[in-house]
Amino acid sequence: MIFDDVLDLAKKVSKYTIAGEGNVSIRDGDTMLIKASGSTLETMTDEDLVRCNLDGNALDDEKKKPSMEVSFHAWILKSFPEIKCVCHTHPTNTNKILCSGDIIDFANKRLFPDQVVRNGIMSCVVPYA
């Protein structure tokens, strides 16, 4: 069942993230379940999921709120009906690069041919405040 697979995926990818950060969402018919704000990928269970419509609005009258990135997940699931789940993380090694003085050089390199196709010939870097 995709639901159990997504929870398993969340736990596995959490090992490569800062403090279990990131989000997962699962399509469920015309709605989605997304990780609740304040929950971690490492420890999440079905109790840490909030039901939302595909516009990103919470449907359950619960104390838990959906992740602040609910709009991003909702947009993907609404725009691409073939997608059943979305998982994104904040990987430790990627964050090391993003916080280093080498980010501009790294961002302007293209390591794989499909990066040019998907990302174009230039990168946009927004420095951390």
Language-model-detected regions and their locations in the chain:
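Glycine-rich flexible loops
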Residues: 1-129
